[in-house]
């Protein structure tokens, strides 16, 4: 058997951090060896990553690669002559570039500068974006590839429109959400906005004959998003609470507001990688809690027609739903709601989900959703129960 290995340099923008080697072992497990260290300052090294830990660095590199369960992952990688298990190849082609942070990995003889390759400022490979969204097309080899470090399972693609970096996220029918996920993102954003929460703004648009939710990038070349999972030794709610408490009361209250909001909209997909903090890339210091995003799997994402027969039918169904974090929405309400969250929820009283200019569910369905939303917010405010 021929064993494959390759050496890379981990860089923070144009600063060399360390040299490492990845081996593709005979048992299919990659091994990483740190060969040389250059600039290991805490202000430069990936935050919350233990300095000089080879196993942790390898896991970090794996996590910034395209998920194996991503929609059209085989089509994306196939267009680049890669496979989903080819970590060395994916790092070589994509250079580990991300829209989350300023890190990248390059081959040891690479001479290019970050300004000419980073995803924040440079043109995307539009043909790969189309493959990522539709599963169809051919790579034309033009532009940087933004799809190799984007998390999530649904079909999605980064686009550059009028100077903004924008994410288009669609809905693959095999996930049995019937095309409702974009509506859910839009309605959830409108509720969070009404509450006064720090939330990513979502719009709706049609691309390649498919409805998509659309949002602008909330990071930039000077500000990173770091998911909360990176800061935890144990992946449970207690650890999350302790982390946000350690940052101060404002951080903790922001976290509590997120948990109450999730309970209100029955967001069953709040996991440890879709919330976190924003980090100043110049100092590697935490700035604030990241804006809320990724609410497509909530009570607004229910395609089954029979659920909309009545408010009672819909409520009976969503009362069977449970959050990823902890064991019930009702317990989260009781544990995380204080006066600030009550004030935020009170702003939803009498609020109606707005119609989009172009793309909408039927009036009957929207009426059911509005009735359910009002019933939930009243129940929470009156009784702290759902």
Language-model-derived ranges and their functions:
Residues 271, 276-278:
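Conserved protein-kinase catalytic-loop segment immediately C-terminal to the catalytic Asp
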Residues 1-260, 264-266, 278-386:
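Phosphate/dinucleotide-binding and metal-coordinating scaffold of catalytic cores
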